[in-house]
């Protein structure tokens, strides 16, 4: 088996899958009393280090955030919302799902704090910057035109129809605004999180 693995030059993840299959087979053989012990129990592969996530330099982020607003009024409205998303991702390090699920009641503008329910349904308090506050306030001035009145339980980031933005929509808007700014980086929310 070792010779076959070496000949095929399998990747680390392929080797892990192969070892997992062997372990399962050996466990089945042991449970069926075909083997007295599982010879694969003590065998472990060396873990390969994961590559670090990409980074974006500050000048590139500033180029995106400081780009002029579009000329069309409907595009200007989208830009206000998108800029609030970008500023929030950049200044707080939130995950995409956390931005997506953010509600109006979760924002404390006076203390520049967000109440975030993250992975494992755990709640934490996250600070955000004054530029993100200003962008959020600019967006929320426009918000009633899209959603109607302010409801504390309403999502902060919504579509023109007043529905909460989905993860894919947020990803697409982040990419779109990077392209509009003339940035060649494949920008996505998780990359902004790592710039925090």
Q: Where on the chain are the PLM-derived regions?
A:
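Conserved catalytic core of the tyrosine transesterase superfamily
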Residues: 1-196
């Amino acid at each position: 088996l070792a010779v076959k693995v070496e000949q095929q030059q399998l990747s680390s993840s392929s080797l892990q899958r192969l070892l997992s299959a062997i372990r399962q087979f050996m466990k089945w053989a042991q449970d069926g009393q075909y083997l007295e012990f599982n010879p694969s129990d003590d065998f472990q592969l060396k873990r390969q280090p994961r590559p670090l996530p990409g980074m974006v330099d500050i000048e590139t982020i500033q180029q995106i955030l400081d780009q002029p607003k579009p000329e069309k009024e409907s595009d200007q409205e989208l830009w206000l919302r998108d800029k609030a998303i970008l500023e929030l991702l950049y200044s707080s390090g939130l995950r995409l799902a956390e931005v997506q699920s953010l509600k109006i009641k979760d924002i404390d503008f006076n203390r520049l704090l967000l109440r975030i329910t993250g992975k494992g349904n755990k709640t934490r308090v996250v600070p955000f910057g004054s530029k993100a506050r200003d962008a959020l306030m600019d967006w929320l001035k426009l918000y009633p035109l899209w959603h109607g009145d302010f409801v504390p339980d309403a999502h902060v980031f919504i579509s023109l129809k007043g529905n909460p933005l989905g993860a894919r929509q947020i990803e697409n808007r982040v990419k779109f605004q990077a392209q509009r700014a003339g940035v060649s980086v494949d920008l996505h929310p998780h990359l902004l999180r790592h710039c925090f």
